[in-house]
């Protein structure tokens, strides 16, 4: 088991050797503010994530719904790893996404961004009218015109990411996430991996995947290459408070600390156009609504903290 863990950790050790120190989100010499020092593209003009300001989004009636194939019930084994920055699941090439312009993209992997720190409970990367959601799911694809992800990641039209924002309110358990969340304890430390048996990505997404925002941007982690066609779904994934707490508190980072707030800060739009394939609803970005949402976030944090306390204090029944 130790030999396997060491083998899986070799790419992480290689990254440390190549760049001097591992990049982080908020600590050390290579936190996200200083990424451009060793990854110059991270200081580019077409970076992600961005704030999706609905009153500025341009409706494009020619944009059609995304065509997702192979997302429904995949049989087999799917490696899941703690890479020190997030939880990442490898996906089969039978999963495809076709954009409105006819470009077909092949799924490579999916990963998650979340909050969890006491001062900031929300951890989505994209925001809507300045409002940050609890978490965000990214399904990374590469352009099928290229033979592999390794080739496509260096090409100007190489990548596409399908993103879904996560809400948590008084929802019951989302059973489509039960298998995934139950495996988090198996990858507590960076480099550890486990295997998911069977995966239904379609059910892990919002029920409605027809409406989206789209723009041209970058990867949100180093090397921040500016070759990503982003599709951010309008409708949300719903998780229970307990599921969200487990996502936020189950794995450790490279500093042996609980991995919290693994999201990049909002980047300037720099004149880019954000389009949608639906007519926007009236904006909720007023100052009043902003503070209402902020208060709701704080109340949600306190509620989840109470739920956590209840779980920890739940008596254990010992059988004779």
From Swiss-Prot:
| GO molecular function annotation | carbonate dehydratase activity; zinc ion binding
Point out the signal peptide segment: 1-17
Identify which cofactors the protein needs according to its UniProt entry. Zn(2+)
Where, in this chain's numbering, is Zn(2+) bound?
111, 113, 138
Q: Which GO terms describe its cellular component?
A: extracellular space
Q: Which UniProt keywords apply?
A: Disulfide bond, Glycoprotein, Lyase, Metal-binding, Secreted, Signal, Zinc
Instruction: State the reactions this protein catalyses.
Output: hydrogencarbonate + H(+) = CO2 + H2O
**Localisation:** Secreted
A Pfam family assignment: Carb_anhydrase
Q: Which SMART domains match?
A: Carb_anhydrase
**Glycosylation sites (chain numbering):** 256
What are the catalytic residues?
Answer: 85
Alpha-carbonic anhydrase domain: residues covered: 21-278
Cysteine pairings via disulfide bonds: 42-224
Q: Where does substrate bind?
A: 220-221
Using the UniProt record, name the top-level EC class of this enzyme in a single word.
lyase
The protein's Enzyme Commission number? 4.2.1.1
Q: What does this protein do?
A: Reversible hydration of carbon dioxide. Its role in saliva is unknown.
Recorded family membership: Belongs to the alpha-carbonic anhydrase family.
This one is known as: Carbonic anhydrase 6
Q: Which organism is it from?
A: Canis lupus familiaris (Dog)
């Amino acid at each position: 088991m130790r030999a396997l863990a060491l083998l899986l950790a070799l790419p992480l050790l290689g990254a440390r050797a190549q760049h001097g120190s591992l990049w982080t989100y908020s600590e050390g010499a290579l936190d996200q503010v200083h990424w451009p020092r060793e990854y110059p593209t991270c200081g580019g003009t077409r970076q992600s994530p961005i704030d999706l300001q609905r009153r500025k989004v341009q409706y494009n009636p020619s944009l059609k719904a995304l065509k997702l194939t192979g997302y429904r019930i995949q049989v087999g084994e799917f490696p899941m790893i703690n890479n020190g920055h997030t939880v990442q699941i490898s996906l089969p090439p039978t999963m495809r996404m076709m954009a409105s312009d006819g470009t077909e993209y092949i799924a490579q992997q999916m990963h998650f961004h979340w909050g969890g720190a006491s001062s900031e409970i929300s951890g989505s990367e994209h925001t809507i009218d300045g409002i940050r959601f609890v978490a965000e799911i990214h399904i990374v694809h590469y352009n099928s015109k290229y033979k592999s992800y390794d080739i496509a990641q260096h090409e100007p039209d190489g990548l596409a990411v399908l993103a879904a924002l996560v809400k948590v309110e008084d929802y019951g358990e989302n059973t489509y996430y039960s298998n995934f969340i139950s495996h988090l304890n198996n990858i507590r430390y960076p480099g550890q991996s486990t295997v998911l048996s069977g995966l239904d990505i379609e059910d892990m997404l919002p029920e409605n995947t027809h409406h989206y925002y789209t723009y041209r941007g970058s990867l949100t982690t180093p090397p921040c290459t500016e070759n990503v066609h982003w599709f951010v779904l309008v409708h949300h994934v719903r998780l229970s408070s307990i599921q969200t707490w487990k996502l936020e508190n189950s794995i450790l980072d490279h500093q042996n600390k609980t991995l919290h707030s693994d999201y990049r800060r909002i980047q300037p739009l720099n004149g880019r156009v954000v389009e949608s394939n639906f007519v926007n609803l009236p904006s909720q970005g007023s100052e009043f609504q902003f503070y209402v949402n902020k208060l709701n976030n704080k109340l949600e944090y306190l509620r989840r903290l109470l739920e956590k306390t209840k779980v920890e204090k739940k008596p254990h029944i010992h059988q004779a």
